[in-house]
């Protein structure tokens, strides 16, 4: 398997640190509004990448965070006249509703920034002790000139970054590119205690701390949109490597941006099309097909007309599948030479820098073959093509997936709620009730594992 590593700019063979296990961190949303198609792209891309790694036999430990304290969240709370927690909790719940509708499987861990403030303070203290961070009257900053490899990920020199980048304007900083680790609280803002006074974490330190605490000081893959390469991922890398002296993430994967009406789709400009509206009008598979039909590193143009075209193409495949399912002949085909050839083509495509356009095209080729086999009354070939779509490739791509249909009986939001309720019960030492929740979930195939970083679960 070869993937393009942003760090080196090259397509490299993927070799995990621990054989058979992949640890990956995907930057998640700042929760102050509904997610849009631009947010959906990394969610779908890395959902499928995780599925494919599992298909290839890897055990994947995936983390996707929620930034639940941020200027945008505070501003939204002020607009609505509510507490910042209300905004964060509301839009995390809305995220799960949209993610479930889009067929996004939950990561193993979904940490919130506010659950890691003590860890963040501890890490900042260590950075200050190492001399790579300093305190000012407005907070604590990372001194980028103390980290020799700053700019390595974005492939830019410090002087070029100063000229072209968006940086925090603060006259108390030693250097324009120095970035905030801890922001001193303004009147009325939510805040936490620290050695530098009451305040809250900076954006970049959040992801560094959550990834290191859950996945370890070095892990395999760090992923997100290409707009995060600088400053967010560059700063994450600088903090982590200055702290530990180790390589932070071995492979960096970044998806291209979604363009809508000629510009990048963005909440800040109001140039958006929500996932909820897209799925409501054109269906889950239509949107997933649209996203996967473009190579993940390429920019993606979005329009409602294009989405409608993808939705129509998906509908035709569903009609072919429905026609076959009426025959009732849904068994297990023989893995003959034709079957193996398709599997090899599928693996070859996704092993080559995760080429989903080729992988998705195989499903449509199989659908055409299935239709012809039914016309020719070739039951053996028809079963083979049907099985490849519904049980072999569909579950990997999250398209036409028979397994997903069965799972929709259980609600992801309900599972998350049960886990949160159980955590509260455990903190209150009401172990009789918390154990009952754990045992009942085990009976339906959901296995809980309590770790220092939170509750992890797997579905058997």
UniProtKB/Swiss-Prot annotation:
Enzyme Commission number(s): 6.1.1.16
Subcellular location: Cytoplasm
SMART domains per record: DALR_2
UniProt binding sites for Zn(2+): 27, 207, 232, 236
'KMSKS' region, short sequence motif: residues: 264-268
Chain ranges for the short sequence motif 'HIGH' region as given in the UniProt record: 29-39
Cofactor binding note of this UniProt entry: Binds 1 zinc ion per subunit.
Listed cofactors: Zn(2+)
Enzyme class of the recorded protein, top EC level: ligase
Metal-binding keyword on record: yes
GO biological process: one example: cysteinyl-tRNA aminoacylation
Molecular function terms, GO-annotated: ATP binding; cysteine-tRNA ligase activity; zinc ion binding
Residues the record lists as binding ATP: 267
Catalytic activity of the protein: tRNA(Cys) + L-cysteine + ATP = L-cysteinyl-tRNA(Cys) + AMP + diphosphate
Cellular component GO terms held in the UniProt record: cytosol
Domain of life: Bacteria
Primary localisation category: cytoplasm
Keywords: Aminoacyl-tRNA synthetase, ATP-binding, Cytoplasm, Ligase, Metal-binding, Nucleotide-binding, Protein biosynthesis, Zinc
Assembly and oligomerization: Monomer.
Family in the record: Belongs to the class-I aminoacyl-tRNA synthetase family.
Official protein name in the record: Cysteine--tRNA ligase
UniProt organism field: Thermotoga petrophila (strain ATCC BAA-488 / DSM 13995 / JCM 10881 / RKU-1)
Name of the gene encoding the protein in the UniProt record: cysS
């Amino acid at each position: 398997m070869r993937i393009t590593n942003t760090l080196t700019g090259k397509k490299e063979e993927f070799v995990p640190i621990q054989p058979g296990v992949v640890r990956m961190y995907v930057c998640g949303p700042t929760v102050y509004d509904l997610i849009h198609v631009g947010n959906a792209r990394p969610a779908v891309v890395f959902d499928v990448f995780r599925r494919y790694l599992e298909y290839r036999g890897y055990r994947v430990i995936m983390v996707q965070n929620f930034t639940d304290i941020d200027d945008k969240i505070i501003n939204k709370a002020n607009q609505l006249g509510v507490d910042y927690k209300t905004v964060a909790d509301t839009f995390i719940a809305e995220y799960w509703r949209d993610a479930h509708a889009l067929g996004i499987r939950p990561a193993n861990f979904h940490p919130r920034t506010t659950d890691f403030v003590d860890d963040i303070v501890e890490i900042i203290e260590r950075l200050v002790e190492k001399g790579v961070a300093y305190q000012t009257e407005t907070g604590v900053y990372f001194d980028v000139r103390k980290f020799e490899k700053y700019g390595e990920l974005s492939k830019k020199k410090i002087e070029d970054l100063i000229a072209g980048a968006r940086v925090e304007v603060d006259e108390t900083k030693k250097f324009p590119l120095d970035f905030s680790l801890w922001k001193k609280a303004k009147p009325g803002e939510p805040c936490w205690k620290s050695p530098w006074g009451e305040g809250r974490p900076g954006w970049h330190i959040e992801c560094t701390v959550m990834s290191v605490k859950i996945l370890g000081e070095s892990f395999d893959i760090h992923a997100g949109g290409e707009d995060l390469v600088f400053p967010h991922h560059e700063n994450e890398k600088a903090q982590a490597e200055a702290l530990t002296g180790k390589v932070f993430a071995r492979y960096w994967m970044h998806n291209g941006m979604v363009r809508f009406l000629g510009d990048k789709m963005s909440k800040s400009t109001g140039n958006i099309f929500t996932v909820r509206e897209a799925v409501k009008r054109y269906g889950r598979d239509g949107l997933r097909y649209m996203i996967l039909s473009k190579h993940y590193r390429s920019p993606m143009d979005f329009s409602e007309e294009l989405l409608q075209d993808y939705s129509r193409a998906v509908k035709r495949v569903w009609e072919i599948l429905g026609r076959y399912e009426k025959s009732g002949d849904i068994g297990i085909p023989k893995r003959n030479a034709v079957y193996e050839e398709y599997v090899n083509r599928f693996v070859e495509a996704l092993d080559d820098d995760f080429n989903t356009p080729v992988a998705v095209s195989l499903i449509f080729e199989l659908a055409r073959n299935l239709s012809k086999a039914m016309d020719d009354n070739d039951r053996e070939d028809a079963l083979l093509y049907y099985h490849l779509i519904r049980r072999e490739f569909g579950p990997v791509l999250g398209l036409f997936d028979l397994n997903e249909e069965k799972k929709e009986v259980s609600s992801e939001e309900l599972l998350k709620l049960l886990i949160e309720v159980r955590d509260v019960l455990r903190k209150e030492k009401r172990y009789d009730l918390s154990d009952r929740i754990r045992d009942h979930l085990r009976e339906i195939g959901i296995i809980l594992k309590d770790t220092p970083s939170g509750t992890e679960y797997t579905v058997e």
